[in-house]
């Protein structure tokens, strides 16, 4: 049952990203980074997402986080599920609020499965432990950094909406985590690699 919940949760994460992309108001800062990678490397969003997830994963592993089934499924499937949803969803700004809620809800649901976290959440957790800061603080700093990388890639999808997301997504994420009772630094996961 945990694996079914994991896959459905990964769909919620990818749906959240796709909803914001198709809202055409701007993109999540991490999506700005992925879009910059698309331009620099001439690859699809799915491939760019895989590359950025791998970079975050390597840092998180360096800091002592471990890989679970959720980590693997996120890296291998997440961006491609986004590709699918963006191809079938309508383009309207009304999708943005739903996407802003779906993404952190999906992140929390993935983590609560106890099968590991996706790479960006592992990265967040590693930074939380390293600097002893809250999800809200760490994620807001991460989002600002992702936005800067996106700006360096001259991503035309970055708008006022992306800036607002970079300043407030960590707050939304922290709030949703509290609502669903998920604390990433306290949950015990089943790991595939680097067991202690």
Go through each PLM region and give its residues.
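Core subunits and conserved enzymes of cellular information-processing
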Residues: 1-196
């Amino acid at each position: 049952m945990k694996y079914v919940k994991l896959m459905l949760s990964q769909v919620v994460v990818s749906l959240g990203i796709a909803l914001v992309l198709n809202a055409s108001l701007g993109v999540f800062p991490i999506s700005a980074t992925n879009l910059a990678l698309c331009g620099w490397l001439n690859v699809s969003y799915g491939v760019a997402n895989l590359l950025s997830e791998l970079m975050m994963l390597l840092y998180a592993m360096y800091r002592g986080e471990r890989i679970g089934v959720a980590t693997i499924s996120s890296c291998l499937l997440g961006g491609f599920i986004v590709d699918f949803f963006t191809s079938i969803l309508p383009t309207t700004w009304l999708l943005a609020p739903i996407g802003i809620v779906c993404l952190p809800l999906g992140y929390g649901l993935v983590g609560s499965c106890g099968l590991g976290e996706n790479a960006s959440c592992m990265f967040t957790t590693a930074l939380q432990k390293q600097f002893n800061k809250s999800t809200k603080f760490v994620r807001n700093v991460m989002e600002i950094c992702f936005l800067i990388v996106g700006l360096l890639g001259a991503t035309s999808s970055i708008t006022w909406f992306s800036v607002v997301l970079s300043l407030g997504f960590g707050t939304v994420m922290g709030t949703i985590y509290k609502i669903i009772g998920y604390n990433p630094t306290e949950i015990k996961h089943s790991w595939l690699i680097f067991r202690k």
